[in-house]
């Protein structure tokens, strides 16, 4: 009798373990409600429950590191390859192999440890009623003396700027990038302040001729989700895609990686693969105004109206953003970039 009870106990323990394992735990620094809707679609298709812990990057990373082997986190998702790369440098991701992910994602938008889910471009904004930028305008040009007092951009502690500078280091070297940063600082129309939308608003208000900001922000403003004033301001502004005569416009990603101690690795891989399907990509671009990672998907019309044929920088591996992040911040700080 005792033997039977023991076997039954093992049976239910195994059943319970299987039930618990049919889930995936995401730690996400992305702030979109639409992501949760996407995870619900994944659950409906696979039966795998998705548990989400949302927060800011620093807090999430601190928790994952402190919990160590006891962490229940399977998948870490965030915006910006620089953040993913920096976390990778701390040894918090594990190598992941997936034929589906490798086939779907261009090699420069992934690493052996993490994968791009969607793309964004960091571009130059201008008011066409006041400014006519040259057709060959580049990021490098913004440091030239003729642009003195004409440029607005966020602070140096912004990771999007750090990744932009990291890409310049990758392409031009530290010495040239340091000189560029000094020139850019001297050309700033004001001390850096505010978010990306604040830079676009400054150009709309005539405070500067050029603003550096990510592409999805103009679409967000045009959508009316940030109010009628920002919508009206955005209608005055256009994005310019720099470096079309060279390597192409600076691209970055939203992405995710499977964590070192992930208890549900197989489910985490399934979720990543789902995020790169046609259904998921269409959902992402139509809700976040990002560019799709896979071919054959059209971005939201609010971003597509500005053109889809621009040359993207497909040469620079986004994994270099994390590797060059410390050097980028040092260069920015030494240049007096607040």
Q: Locations of the language-model features?
A:
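Short beta-strand->loop
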Residues: 27-30, 126-128, 148-172, 185-188, ...
């Amino acid at each position: 009798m005792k033997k039977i009870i023991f076997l039954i106990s093992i049976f239910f323990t195994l059943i319970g373990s299987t039930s618990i394992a049919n889930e995936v735990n995401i730690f996400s620094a992305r702030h979109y409600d639409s992501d949760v809707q996407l995870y619900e679609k994944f659950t409906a298709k696979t039966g795998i429950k998705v548990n989400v812990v949302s927060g800011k990057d620093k807090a999430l990373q601190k928790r994952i590191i402190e919990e160590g082997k006891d962490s229940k986190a399977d998948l870490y998702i965030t915006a910006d390859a620089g953040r993913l790369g920096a976390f990778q440098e701390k040894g918090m991701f594990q190598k992941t192999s997936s034929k589906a992910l490798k086939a779907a994602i261009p090699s420069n938008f992934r690493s052996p440890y993490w994968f791009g889910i969607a793309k964004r471009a960091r571009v130059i904004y201008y008011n066409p009623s006041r400014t006519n930028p040259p057709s060959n305008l580049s990021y490098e040009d913004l440091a030239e003396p003729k642009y003195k007092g004409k440029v607005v951009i966020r602070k140096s502690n912004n990771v999007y700027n750090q990744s932009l500078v990291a890409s310049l280091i990758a392409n031009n070297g530290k010495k040239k990038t340091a000189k560029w940063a000094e020139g850019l600082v001297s050309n700033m129309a004001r001390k850096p302040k505010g978010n990306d939308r604040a830079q676009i608003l400054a150009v709309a208000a005539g405070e500067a001729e050029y603003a550096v900001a990510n592409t999805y922000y103009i679409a967000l403003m045009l959508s009316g989700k940030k109010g009628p004033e920002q919508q009206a301001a955005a209608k005055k502004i256009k994005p310019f895609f720099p470096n079309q005569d060279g390597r192409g416009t600076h691209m970055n990603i939203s992405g995710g990686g499977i964590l070192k101690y992930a208890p549900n690795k197989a489910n985490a891989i399934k979720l990543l693969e789902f995020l790169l399907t046609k259904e998921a990509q269409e959902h992402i671009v139509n809700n976040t105004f990002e560019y799709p990672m896979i071919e054959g998907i059209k971005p939201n019309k609010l971003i597509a109206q500005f053109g889809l044929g621009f040359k993207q920088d497909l040469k620079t591996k986004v994994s270099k953003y994390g590797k060059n992040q410390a050097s980028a911040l040092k260069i920015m700080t030494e240049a007096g970039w607040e």
